[in-house]
Amino acid sequence: MDDQIKEIRQKKHQQYLDHLNGIIPNNQDKQNHIVVPNLINQINPINATNQINPINTTGQRNHVLDKIKFNYAAIRIQRFIRKKMFEPKCINEEEILSIPSIYRLRIDITDMHINEYNEEDIPNDILEYHRIIYKSINFSTDSTLFFRYCFDIRKLYPIRHQQINIFGEYFYLQPDDHKYINCIWKKVNNITSESIRYLTDFDYHKSLSVDSHKSN
C-alpha cells in the first residue's frame, strides 16, 4: 500500500511539474510572459475567434489575474466571517478533536428532527426559548435550530435510519441530512473505486502540504 501511494505521489508531482512547464516559460521569457488559458476571451470577447493582438495582452492578463486573486480572497473572507460570526459552533467541540477531519459531518439539529417523529411534542415554552436565541440566525426558515452536532460519519452511516441519541435525547435525521450523508459517504467509504481514488488523492495532498510546511 505504501509503495502504491508513493508511486501515485510521484506521478502527481510529475503531472504538476508538467503543468507548470506548460504555462510558465523558462529562462528570460519567464518574467515577460504569462500564458493564461481561457482568460483572454473574457478580456476581449470580440477577438475571441480571431488572432489576439500581443501588444496589450500582458497588462490585460495581469489585470485579470489580480482581479481573480482579489475575488478569491473576498470569497475566502466572506466564508470565514459567515462561519465564525453567524454559524453556531458544534456542542461537542472537544469530541471533534478525536474525529479525523475527513470523517467529520456537521448537522444542524432543529425542532423538525424531534416533533415529526416523537409521540409527544416538545413544550411550546422550550421551543419559544430556542426561537428567541436563534432568531437572528434562522429568521428566514420555518424550523428552530437547537444546536449543531459533529458526527463521525463512519459511526453515523450504519445507523442513519434509526433514532440518534444525543445527550440522552432522541432525534431522526431529515431527508436533506440523508442526501448530505450519502454524498459524503460516497467519497470516504473506502470501498468503491471512486472513494479509494478520493482518499488516495486526499492523503497525497495532505502529505504534500506537510512536506511543503516542513521545507519552509
Swiss-Prot record:
Domain of life according to the entry: Viruses
Stated name of the protein: Uncharacterized protein L262
Gene source species: Acanthamoeba polyphaga mimivirus
